[in-house]
Amino acid sequence: EHLITAEVMVASFAQAPSQATVARLKEAGVVVIPTIGARRHAEKVAEWGVDAVIAQGTEGGGHTGVVPTSLLIPQVLDAVDLPVIAAGGFVDGRGLAAALAWGADGIAMGTRFLLTADSSVPDNVKAEYLATPSTGTVVTTAIDGAPQRVIATDMVRRLEAARLTRFPRAAANALRFRRLTGTSLRALLAEGIRMKKAQDLTWGQVALAANAPMLTRATMVEGRTEVGILPTGQGVGSIDELPSVADLVSRIVAEATEALDRLCGG
């Protein structure tokens, strides 16, 4: 309802929303583009009437699946009659050209846009990203029970080792999330039940769900890298500078055009 009241034109979701949420947004004229990581998920949201899908391969940051981008995109294109935006490991125009060659309609980039001069992420956090090689990421379920690709920091290693304290930590984060958002306890419980049904989660995964937003906020908003997580795609190791968004987009278009011309013998 906040999105509708604010007259947001496009709603993108890191994980698929409920069918009722899609219907409500579509009724209000909002373009709905969820992110999916498997063919079956694309088929499900297509039945719900979404406008397009972002298909993210395992190279992508944050919540991610197990299928590489180069395999996932053709699978999704064969499964749905929707615009398909490729994601997971894209940082330059060569990647855009590759995605277009697979049949995708474009690319989505998270880590690459995060590492720009225009990004509001704290400078010390950007420095952590720039110092990370492609081999410096890990996929872990220790944060909220679902696989997430993050930078392999000491904090992540502590989360993976501290299985006995995982649920008390999640409960504390749930209370902080409730205070931050003004959400009632009843609403949190209802959302947990909805998540379990919509995403086929275990109750353990539902209990851990508040961890991700609070640990991400600690780094991305507060700059506290020692107590938060750093979601990132594997493309992070190919990034070594912070251009403006305008310069980055122009460069990517030029690189993609050059690559496609070369493929066409131009």
Explain the meaning of each model-derived region.
Residues 1-85, 92-111, 182-186, 191:
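Alpha/beta enzyme core
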Residues 69-81, 91-266:
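Conserved active-site-proximal phosphate/metal-binding subdomains
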